[in-house]
């Protein structure tokens, strides 16, 4: 501080790590920026360790408050001869690199990529030799040009070591070299400061003040200590000097900083800040050039392919409205120079189709007629009220987002195609930031605090998937711990603070970034956990914030199932047309009455998108009878319409339209009638909200899209409030009442909870109908396709098989003499191809402990001739003992050896001996008499070995005992009158708590006659938490409710009857 004037010196923090320096930084980018701005800093740097993962978030936060940001990174530099993983000794030092311009940023990004890709995931190593003499291909990185380099000496500094380091440092970095001074009020700060001052003076090197910041405020110190303990894998009490001695690594006041550092060191921070001219806004994405053939520009090639596709889509002539729309879209795409993006996606889709990989674009891309003509999407925009501005507009200021789903079992082929075409140096997956969830946070913090491991596990297991941070103390109390005990309260507080902190980078589900030049100069790239893949350090939100392109190559299980089903139909029934082409999506008859009858009954187990509890409850009320009804059905069971109060008014208007209720469907204006007519005056889709803003409040299409994005982010960022006055004023100006305007705004807020775009729903509705048609008309093929496409969907194989059997499908057991690896079709008597219903033979893939290679050898041996015995099968297929035991336990030898117990005996006898007993004589004639297993034994063994049974349902075995307890079956409850008391019991197959359910848990029970839907209200859930969440076999007493074919049991009391099926390994799935 200037003693004469009392003016605080300017200061910029140039050494600051966020929580993206995993388990080092204890504050988020947003917290750091807010604190720096509040303290009046001139600027701040983001210098996460060998990472730029936190830079986009820091950039957005700093830009919002007008705080200059320097992009950099910190590295721990170890001596050349230091063994990795060992104490590097006094020769180690810290290195802060700060990008001065775009070239320097590219060099920094490439350096990070090089070191990350040459080390195990999550680690890196940097030595002086690497900086001074990188490999020939990276020779341009020598000395990391266009970056400031700050040497941070090991504390406390030693004159001899520091002099040697500075001599090397100065020779390598020259005028960009700086010597960093850190003052954290440690015991040897004075001596350290003097050594740094003297060394800088001897070398003529500028000294710069550094805060070595890892948190925004001092009170984060307990969290930082806990993270240190987690990182080191030991309790805090054992961390010793690894812990920071105090809380000084926060963004201190300028007054405090002025007391700690020389004026020149403070001034140097601002001089360096002013010399750094790079911003992440300077990044410019360059599209690949390979996708344009010789003789074409991107504009001409996109136009050529679009018009060719239009002629295929409209063989009777392209309608004038479509022609005009194509011309408009092509002109806008050319004006924004996005043609290469469309062509990149088009190339990917063309490749997939050439390999007969089912794919379908979805999301906002379905709003585009160009995407439809290119074959990227399958939804004709002419058949709906899709809004192109939801996809692309001038005001949007960022590339469009095209999501393409591929068969989940073949998506890897598409990913490898991208790597092969563009090379690993130009293509990588976007990151997904894995964050701390409640159980993980409780476990990690509990261990760090030294809590007994058994107690840690008890508390963690008590916290379920739907519990939030507010529930932490309640969970401690539920296991008998006093929340007022200081240790328990500290544990809860630190665990809550750690929630949602970045834990590590994983790979996005399919967001691909492809560049014209080296991708590593745009963003750091590191190895993914999966071999053969690389991942950038930014996630999809970071890419969107910076306006950078990604292509979403997503996996969808239902596409795999549909493709398999279509191939089975072709093989079983023959080609659908004389031209011999295989059965495909377009061959499914539209508007099939029997299919819609099934959908209206909510008979949709296994069907895409409409198989969840919430969807099944809505189906009998909405009663879809056509494609657009399915579009609405897919969309309406979402938080947006539910929170926006759209569901009940829409259902009531459907009843009015059908003549089942009195009333009139009215619209506030003709303009809004055009927007809302298809949904009877009720906004269901995101596009409708945007259109309301345009026609009723005077928004431009681009402004409406900004509103849509604000809706998506308002819960997280609170950005929606600024639109309130604009919407209300705009609607008042156009003659709408204030009451109606406020109602519209509340509905818009509801859509902030996640409203479905119509374009997305339109794509999904096609697959929902296709899978429904298959379930109704080809149930055996549908089952086989689903089984062969696992894991996918809402239901595990056991429930899929039980449902198929209730629909008359014959399911045959696993048989080593007949089964392949996958489920297959077999003719039944009188039902040979192409007529009649086939039976489904379960595949060997269900057998736990059996590998695909062993199954392949069985198939190859079987092709050479039938097996006469287990011993012959074992010998010809070269099976190991573990393979034979797995098959015997799964009853796959029934045709060769009788029951399980006999089969297991024969399997052991047939197994090749190894080691000392290989030559021992064995008298196989002596064989004990083995009793046949009971039906219950077989059922339990089925679940244990293949996860399902073809015998009687486990609950059927208990029916006499359940009858004695007056517990009804699902079938008996169907005719129960509304409002009557009822009792039921079944295996728990699903637990679901949607975010809009206000704490209500939906439980599905399955017995031998069907399923019972149970509603557990929050107060009962809290009172009987263990019974609700831990039971495999659950008895429920409550009130039976049935209305409009919607039936459920509202629970009043729960009883865990799992001991009745002790040892049965069933599976239930838990969902938000």
Swiss-Prot record:
<protein>
    <recommendedName>
        <fullName>Error-prone DNA polymerase</fullName>
        <ecNumber>2.7.7.7</ecNumber>
    </recommendedName>
</protein>
<dbReference type="GO" id="GO:0003887">
    <property type="term" value="F:DNA-directed DNA polymerase activity"/>
</dbReference>
<dbReference type="InterPro" id="IPR004013">
    <property type="entry name" value="PHP_dom"/>
</dbReference>
<comment type="similarity">
    <text>Belongs to the DNA polymerase type-C family. DnaE2 subfamily.</text>
</comment>
<dbReference type="InterPro" id="IPR040982">
    <property type="entry name" value="DNA_pol3_finger"/>
</dbReference>
<dbReference type="GO" id="GO:0008408">
    <property type="term" value="F:3'-5' exonuclease activity"/>
</dbReference>
<keyword id="KW-0963">Cytoplasm</keyword>
<dbReference type="Pfam" id="PF17657">
    <property type="entry name" value="DNA_pol3_finger"/>
</dbReference>
<dbReference type="Pfam" id="PF02811">
    <property type="entry name" value="PHP"/>
</dbReference>
<keyword id="KW-0234">DNA repair</keyword>
<dbReference type="InterPro" id="IPR004805">
    <property type="entry name" value="DnaE2/DnaE/PolC"/>
</dbReference>
<dbReference type="InterPro" id="IPR016195">
    <property type="entry name" value="Pol/histidinol_Pase-like"/>
</dbReference>
<dbReference type="InterPro" id="IPR003141">
    <property type="entry name" value="Pol/His_phosphatase_N"/>
</dbReference>
<dbReference type="GO" id="GO:0005737">
    <property type="term" value="C:cytoplasm"/>
</dbReference>
<dbReference type="InterPro" id="IPR011708">
    <property type="entry name" value="DNA_pol3_alpha_NTPase_dom"/>
</dbReference>
<dbReference type="InterPro" id="IPR023073">
    <property type="entry name" value="DnaE2"/>
</dbReference>
<dbReference type="Pfam" id="PF07733">
    <property type="entry name" value="DNA_pol3_alpha"/>
</dbReference>
<dbReference type="InterPro" id="IPR029460">
    <property type="entry name" value="DNAPol_HHH"/>
</dbReference>
<dbReference type="GO" id="GO:0006260">
    <property type="term" value="P:DNA replication"/>
</dbReference>
<comment type="function">
    <text>DNA polymerase involved in damage-induced mutagenesis and translesion synthesis (TLS). It is not the major replicative DNA polymerase.</text>
</comment>
<dbReference type="GO" id="GO:0006281">
    <property type="term" value="P:DNA repair"/>
</dbReference>
<keyword id="KW-0808">Transferase</keyword>
<keyword id="KW-0239">DNA-directed DNA polymerase</keyword>
<keyword id="KW-0548">Nucleotidyltransferase</keyword>
<keyword id="KW-0227">DNA damage</keyword>
<dbReference type="Pfam" id="PF14579">
    <property type="entry name" value="HHH_6"/>
</dbReference>
<keyword id="KW-0235">DNA replication</keyword>
